[in-house]
């Protein structure tokens, strides 16, 4: 789940650690946050005693009443109606729900969605439902599930007549219904593209894997000596994950294109002058030009974000548009944002070390800034 640390998801912090009992080596373990109401309270400005937290279909904290009302409303509503979707956007954290499903589908977690699913809301009139990403050890090509990088987990996640485990009908219902709405559908596609352009990039994932493996590989032999049935074929399993990271993006694009009848994946280039950034859907690039791939059929959202001391001037390609806009992408698409300083020249980083104001009458050193 560490792959999603910068995404709008609730994930457990963790670290590998070595255990010694009375100076005897006891193995390599993972220390993780426990997902309960206190986990929610430590990550959000809410009272942990005043939330609804559901695991699978049972309330661990609070009740299931509000969620049951949500499901009843969805089942009785026309999800193609924009007004219905706008209303649901006040009931569900839509961005979180999209990111959650994108994550589970991409990693091919098939011990879900009828299991290992927790979701919560503050018990407030405007409290929105959010989903927690945890226990994803069936993902990334786990051998005993078969397949992995070539499994169409998107179809799996919308199966209307699945078995009791792992994807029964109740567990896929909300996602299936939301996908009937064109606004949700387009946002889902764009977020998937955002992730494929960034954290789902093969090179990025393999670098993270290699870093994590390097961090613990020296202790694996000692762990195996202590627990002979643990970490069997460790190098092989690391390679399974590496293979998944290498091939999964291409397969996932194919599944998106087939499911949503998409065509014309185009390369888009974004440029920004000194003094600001461009937010592309959910991404704010670290450097420019930034290149991403998006579908010609699906408009993207862009927003010019000026740095302190700068103001947005405009887009040469869209001179009549403001700082935020939704635009189509097309072959050889380029977009540039222009910023200018409003301080009449180059800006500098100013550091104030000391301020003295209104000294005591008995020791008046004047007012000064240093």
What is the meaning of each model-derived region?
Residues 264-292:
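Conserved N-terminal submotifs of small, disulfide-stabilized extracellular modules
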Residues 282-299, 321-327:
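Short, solvent-exposed S/T- and G/P-enriched segments that are highly enriched in secreted/extracellular
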Residues 341-370:
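A structural motif detector for short, solvent-exposed N-terminal "entry" segments of globular domains
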Residues 270, 325-344:
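Conserved "repeat-terminator" motif of extracellular CCP/Sushi domains
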Residues 299-323:
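Surface-exposed interfaces of beta-sheet-rich extracellular modules
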Residues 6, 16-20, 25-29, 40, ...:
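Middle-to-C-terminal accessory/interaction subdomains
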């Amino acid at each position: 789940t560490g792959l999603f640390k910068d995404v709008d998801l609730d994930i457990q912090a963790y670290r590998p650690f070595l255990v010694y009992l009375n100076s005897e080596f006891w193995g390599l373990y993972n220390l993780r946050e426990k997902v309960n109401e206190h986990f929610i309270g430590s990550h959000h400005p809410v009272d942990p005693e005043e939330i609804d937290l559901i695991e699978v279909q049972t309330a661990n904290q609070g009740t299931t009443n509000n969620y049951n009302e949500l499901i009843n409303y969805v089942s009785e509503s026309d999800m193609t109606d924009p007004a219905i979707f706008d209303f649901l956007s006040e009931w569900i954290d839509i961005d979180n729900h999209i990111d959650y499903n994108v994550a589970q589908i991409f990693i091919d977690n098939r011990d879900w969605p009828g299991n290992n699913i927790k979701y919560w809301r503050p018990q407030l009139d405007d409290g929105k439902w959010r989903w927690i990403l945890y226990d994803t050890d069936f993902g990334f090509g786990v051998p005993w599930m078969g397949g992995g990088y070539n499994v169409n987990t998107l179809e799996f996640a919308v199966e209307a007549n699945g078995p009791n485990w792992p994807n029964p009908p109740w567990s896929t219902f909300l996602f299936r219904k939301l996908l009937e709405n064109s606004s949700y559908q387009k946002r889902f596609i764009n977020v998937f593209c955002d992730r494929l352009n960034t954290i789902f990039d093969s090179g990025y994932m393999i670098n993270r894997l290699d870093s994590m493996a390097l961090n613990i590989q020296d202790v694996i032999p000692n762990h195996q000596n202590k627990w002979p049935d643990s970490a069997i074929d460790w190098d092989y399993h690391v390679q399974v994950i590496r293979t998944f990271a290498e091939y999964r993006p291409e397969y996932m694009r194919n599944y998106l294109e087939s499911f949503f009848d998409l065509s014309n994946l185009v390369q888009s280039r974004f440029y920004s002058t000194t003094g600001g950034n461009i937010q592309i859907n959910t991404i704010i690039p670290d450097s420019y030009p930034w290149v991403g791939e998006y579908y010609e059929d699906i408009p993207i959202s862009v927003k010019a974000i000026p740095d302190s001391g700068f103001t947005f001037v405009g887009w040469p390609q869209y001179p009549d548009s403001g700082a935020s806009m939704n635009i189509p992408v097309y072959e050889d698409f380029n977009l540039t944002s222009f910023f200018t300083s409003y301080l009449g020249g180059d800006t500098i980083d100013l550091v104030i070390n000391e301020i003295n104001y209104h000294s005591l009458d008995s020791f008046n050193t004047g007012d000064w800034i240093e």
